[in-house]
Amino acid sequence: GFAWTMLCMNEIFYFIGALGPLFIVLALTGLELGVAILQAYVFTILICIYLNDAINLH
């Protein structure tokens, strides 16, 4: 509507408006990958702790 027409009137804003969603998607994908790596790290540490406790009974 009106906002898109105003963005298209200036080429600089059109360029930013065209690439803005791409950068947002890339940032969210990077954040998601970072969270996945952190979850894998925590899972590995917890597995090591649990296995250590299971093997070395006190």
UniProtKB/Swiss-Prot annotation:
GO molecular function terms listed in the Swiss-Prot or TrEMBL record: proton-transporting ATP synthase activity, rotational mechanism
Chief localization: mitochondrion
Keyword line: ATP synthesis, CF(0), Hydrogen ion transport, Ion transport, Membrane, Mitochondrion, Mitochondrion inner membrane, Transmembrane, Transmembrane helix, Transport
Location(s) in or outside the cell: Mitochondrion inner membrane
Transmembrane intervals: 11-31, 35-55
Recorded topology in the membrane: Multi-pass membrane protein
InterPro entries reported for this sequence: ATP_synth_F0_asu_bact/mt, F0_ATP_A_sf
Cellular compartments per GO CC: mitochondrial inner membrane; proton-transporting ATP synthase complex
Highest taxon above the source species: Eukaryota
Function recorded in the entry: Mitochondrial membrane ATP synthase (F(1)F(0) ATP synthase or Complex V) produces ATP from ADP in the presence of a proton gradient across the membrane which is generated by electron transport complexes of the respiratory chain. F-type ATPases consist of two structural domains, F(1) - containing the extramembraneous catalytic core and F(0) - containing the membrane proton channel, linked together by a central stalk and a peripheral stalk. During catalysis, ATP synthesis in the catalytic domain of F(1) is coupled via a rotary mechanism of the central stalk subunits to proton translocation.
Recorded family membership: Belongs to the ATPase A chain family.
Subunit structure: F-type ATPases have 2 components, CF(1) - the catalytic core - and CF(0) - the membrane proton channel. CF(1) has five subunits: alpha(3), beta(3), gamma(1), delta(1), epsilon(1). CF(0) has three main subunits: a, b and c.
Protein name (record): ATP synthase subunit a
Organism: Brassica tournefortii (Wild turnip)
Gene that encodes it: ATP6
